[in-house]
C-alpha cells in the first residue's frame, strides 16, 4: 500500500514537473517570439529612418541643383597655363555659389593682380568637395592646391608667392604650409603670406573696416552680428578675441558668433 501510494506520488510529481516544464517552454517560446518581433520592428524603423534620410538628402541636393547661383561663365577660374616665371597663387577654401565666388574670391584675386602686375595670379581651392560640386553642376574646373602647384611646375615658374584668404591660422592653413614645404624644391623662391587675423594690428584693421562698413546701422538700438563658421582647433580663439577687442574699442552693439563652435549663436 505504501509502495503504491509512493508510486502515485511520484507519478503526480512527474506530471507536475512535465506541466511546469511545458509552461516554462511555452513562456520561453513566447518571450523569444516577442523579442524577434521587437527586433523586426526596430529594424523596420531603422530602415525607414535611413530611407527617409536618403530621401531628404536627395531632395536637398535637388533643391541646391535647381537653385540659381549665377552664371559660372562670368567667373575667372584662373587655371590657365602660360604663367611665366613669377606666379602669385591665391588659395581660398572656396564656394560653389557662382556669383559669390566672383564677387568675393574673384574680387580679391583681381585686387591682387592690380597691385602686383609683374605676377601672374592663379587660383587654388582647398575644399575638394566644392571643386567636385562645381565640376559636376557647371562643368567648370577649379584647381586644388596640388593641381595648382603642379601647373606652376609644368609652366616653369621660378618665383612662387602664395597668399591664402583664410581667416585664421587653422587646420586649412597648416595643411597648405606643409604641402608647400614638401614642394619648395621645385622652385627657386617660395614665399607664403599669413592669414587675415594674425597680429593685433590685423584685428584692428579688420575692426576698422567692418565698423566703417556698417556704421549706418549702429544707432544704439540695433545689434550688429558677424558670424563665422568656427573650428575645433585652438585657432577658434580669434572669434572671442575679435569680440573682446570690439568691446574694448567701444563697439558695444557689435557681436561675433560662430555656427559650429564658440561663441555660439546662443552666446550672441
Annotate each predicted stretch with a short phrase.
Residues 14-20, 47, 52:
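Hydrophobic core
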Residues 1-10:
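Bacterial Sec-dependent N-terminal signal peptides
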